[in-house]
C-alpha cells in the first residue's frame, strides 16, 4: 500500500509481461481494496492473467452487490479469476474456456480462517502449473483451505499438503 511497494509491483508486472511470464494478483484483504483501489488499478494496468480475491473484495472493488455481477465486471481487469466464497467454495472464471465454474467446499467445522485465502491461491497456482484444469485446481484449493480452517494457525502441518494431493489424485 506504499508508493514504493506500488512502484515495485508495477515494475515486476512490466518485467513479467516483457518476458511472457503470466501475472497473478491477489487483492489481499477487504481493507486494501477500500483504501488502495487506485493503486490496484495502477498495478493492474491493462489487465492481469489471474486475479484472486474473496467475495467481499470482488464486490467492493467492482461496486456491485452480488458476487456474480462483480465477477462479470472484474473480467475487464483480468483474463481469469478465482473468487473464494468462504464455506460455499469458489467461483472461478476460466478465460480459455470462457466459462464460470462453481466449486463446492467440503463441509467442515471452521475454527480459524487465518491464511485460508493464501493457501487457496497457492494451491490453485500449484494445480494449474502441474497440469490440473481450473476446475480441478479449484477443487484441490477448496479442499486445502477447508482443511486449514479446521485448525488454529495459518499453515497446514508438514505432511498434510502431500496427503491432500494424494487423496485428491486417487
Regions found by a protein language model. Give the residues of each.
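Ribokinase/PfkB-type carbohydrate-kinase core domain
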Residues: 1-102, 132, 161, 169
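Conserved post-catalytic alpha-helical subdomain immediately downstream of the catalytic base
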Residues: 83, 87, 104-169
Amino acid at each position: 500500500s506504499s508508493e514504493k511497494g506500488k512502484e515495485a509491483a508495477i515494475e515486476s508486472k512490466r518485467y513479467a509481461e516483457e518476458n511472457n511470464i503470466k501475472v497473478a494478483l491477489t487483492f489481499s484483504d477487504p481493507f486494501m481494496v477500500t483504501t488502495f483501489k487506485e493503486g490496484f488499478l495502477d498495478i493492474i494496468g491493462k489487465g492481469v492473467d489471474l486475479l484472486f480475491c474473496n467475495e467481499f473484495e470482488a464486490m467492493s472493488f467492482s461496486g456491485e452487490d452480488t458476487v456474480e455481477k462483480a465477477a462479470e465486471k472484474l473480467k475487464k481487469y483480468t483474463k481469469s479469476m478465482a473468487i473464494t466464497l468462504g464455506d460455499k467454495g469458489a467461483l472461478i472464471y476460466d478465460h480459455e474456456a470462457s466459462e464460470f465454474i462453481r466449486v463446492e467446499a467440503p463441509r467442515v467445522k471452521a475454527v480459524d480462517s487465518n491464511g485460508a485465502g493464501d493457501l487457496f491461491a497457492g494451491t490453485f497456482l500449484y494445480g494449474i502449473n502441474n497440469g490440473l484444469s481450473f476446475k480441478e485446481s479449484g477443487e484441490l484449493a477448496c479442499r486445502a483451505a477447508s482443511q486449514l480452517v479446521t485448525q488454529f494457525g495459518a499453515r497446514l502441518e508438514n505432511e498434510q499438503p502431500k496427503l491432500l494431493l494424494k487423496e485428491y489424485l486417487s
